[in-house]
């Protein structure tokens, strides 16, 4: 009898594993810039501390389309997306200015098309920021993107790869504002654009309005006086199947809704990009202070 039980024990353990299902684990990804990495780490730590579920990080994966493919194929379960990006780049809609309308549309279409759920936005709007050096803004009296059109024929521009191709990026911006630069804009990694501008390699870039380096590098954001850019509210997007498998995750993510303002996001980004602090430490400190 004992020998029989000994032979059966591995099979019984395997059966128990199958019955109980796979080990609890969620895979969190991020795009290839600091803010996305930082928010993904905040989300990962929030899930771990509130639910006890193990989180695998796959940070700095790539751009919007890489992360979108990863979540729709199940390679990751969650990442941080922006409403205007989803609306124009993924769902191929023309840019509109109404934030609530954009959020409602992406929520409905993501659930219907991709079985992906939008959670509550963090609270800030990270729009594209057309940036110039402070000295140039003063010298040429630049306050708006319309002002930029006056000097653009003598200037060099440097833009991220996505911005050069997206429906809400450079092609539409150039059309709306009549921008014509001295040469075709230089394509570069988004994370390199601010330093290229500060170092004088280019004269204007498209960055992020919540970039912590804007103040540190003495850059100026030109006002979008023709309201070209749509709203870009950041929020976790997660596969619906994951929420069904792990119901407590929804409550954990809901706690993050509305907790980060534009200025707070700039401060957090600056801690990473200017003070060079570890993003895991920044995330842990923020969660401890804001959601004890």
Question: What annotation goes with each model-predicted range?
Answer:
Residues 90-119, 199-202, 213-227:
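Ligand-binding "clamshell"
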Residues 164, 168-169, 174-176, 247-292:
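An extracytoplasmic/periplasmic, membrane-proximal ligand-sensing/linker region
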Residues 60-64, 74-87, 102-106, 133, ...:
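Beta->alpha turn/N-cap motifs
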Residues 23-36, 53-59, 153-158:
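Short, well-ordered beta-strand elements
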Residues 43-51, 145-183, 285-289:
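Ligand-binding cleft/hinge of the Venus flytrap
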Residues 72-81, 152-156, 172, 197-207:
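Alpha-to-beta junction loops
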Residues 100-157, 240, 258-262:
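A conserved helix-loop-strand patch within extracytoplasmic ligand-binding domains
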Residues 54-69, 183-195:
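Short helix-initiation/N-cap motifs at beta->coil->alpha
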């Amino acid at each position: 009898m004992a020998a029989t039980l000994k032979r059966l024990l591995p099979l019984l353990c395997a059966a128990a594993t199958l019955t109980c299902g796979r080990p609890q684990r969620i895979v969190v990804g991020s795009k290839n810039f600091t803010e996305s990495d930082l928010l993904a780490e905040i989300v990962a730590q929030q899930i771990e501390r509130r639910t006890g579920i193990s989180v695998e990080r796959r940070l700095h994966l790539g751009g919007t389309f890489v992360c979108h493919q990863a979540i729709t194929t199940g390679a990751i379960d969650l990442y941080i997306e922006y409403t205007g990006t989803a609306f124009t780049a993924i769902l191929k809609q023309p840019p509109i200015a109404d934030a609530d309308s954009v959020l409602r549309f992406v929520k409905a279409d993501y659930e219907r098309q991709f079985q992906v759920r939008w959670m509550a936005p963090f609270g800030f709007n990270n729009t594209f920021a057309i940036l110039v050096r402070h000295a140039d803004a003063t010298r040429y009296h630049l306050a708006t993107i319309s002002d930029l059109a006056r000097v653009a024929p003598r200037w060099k521009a440097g833009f991220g790869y996505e911005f050069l191709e997206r429906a809400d990026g450079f092609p539409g911006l150039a059309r709306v504002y009549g921008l014509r630069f001295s040469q075709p804009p230089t394509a570069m990694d988004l994370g390199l654009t601010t330093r290229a501008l500060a170092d004088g390699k280019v004269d204007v870039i498209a960055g992020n309005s919540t970039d912590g380096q804007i103040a540190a590098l003495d850059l100026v954001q030109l006002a979008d006086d023709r309201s070209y850019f749509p709203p870009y509210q950041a929020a976790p997007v997660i596969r619906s199947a994951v929420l069904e498998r792990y119901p407590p995750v929804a409550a954990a993510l809901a706690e993050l809704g509305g907790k980060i303002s534009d200025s707070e996001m700039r401060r957090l980004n600056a801690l990473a990009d200017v003070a060079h602090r570890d993003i895991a430490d920044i995330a842990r400190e923020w969660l401890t202070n804001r959601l004890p």
